[in-house]
Amino acid sequence: ELKESASKITSHFFKEAIELCCISNGKCGKCSENCKFCSQSRYYNTEIQQSVLKSVDEFFKEAQANDKRGVHRFSIVTAGVRLSKAELKTIAQAYKKISSELKISCCGSLGLLDYDDFVMLKESGLKRYHNNLETSPNFFKEICTTHTMKQKEDTIALAKKAGLEICSGCILGMGESVEDRVDIALELRKLQVDSTPINILNPIKGTPLENRPTVHPDEVRRTIALFRHVLPKTVLRLAGGRLIIQKYFTDLYKYGINAEITGDMLTTAGLTVADDISAAISNQKILTKIEPIK
């Protein structure tokens, strides 16, 4: 019944639409924060190598390649709690070039920025800002202690004030309870987000969560259906950890998924754009950018 009603809700608001987005690992490693799931934290001994911010030309070429493949959104993602003003200027220049020359829509996940930063980025072509809440308010302190959920929610509020769409979601399998999953869905509804990425933890060696068991497929299905009921007008985006559920990911369309991060993730492998397009078409889906439902 949960599956059937979730499918009906998705069809009612989104028909058979499926949206594809991709991410660019704009700056990697040596993050000052201690999120227990993340291999980029300087607190943990992982194999991630630090990198400097990519150039405007590098960002543009990535966006251009994905635009040609039929991807609808391109997000620049950077490690660290925030970027320098010079780094933000480089990213703004990239957004300006991408938005003026390509069809692909610009997104960003650049940390805890301030209002003036968001205004500047929006004027440069940024459409949507991403900042994951990760988990419930109650469980958040078990995952990260170097910043708070309130800081994340304040950042989201500033991005909305600047006129940006919001993308915010969670990670399943970090040790949270079913109640925590309900709470994070309710928290996201309160924030009125436009898109919710649902990640499945991919335990990475060297992080505190390296020995966490993989989430059972039935838990993933039930959680997605739950989110669809709580967030009927929000795009539910299958995100990190996709290879863990590769064998049954198209089944998740029936539970409420109507978007996917395609290609490689930040520090783990993903599925190719061609794979995702083929899967969507074989399931009678229509590949298209989905605009926010107000």
Language model features by range: what are they?
Residues 59-62, 90-98, 117, 151-158, ...:
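A general structural detector for well-ordered alpha-helical segments in enzyme core domains, enriched
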Residues 189-294:
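Auxiliary Fe-S-binding modules of radical SAM enzymes
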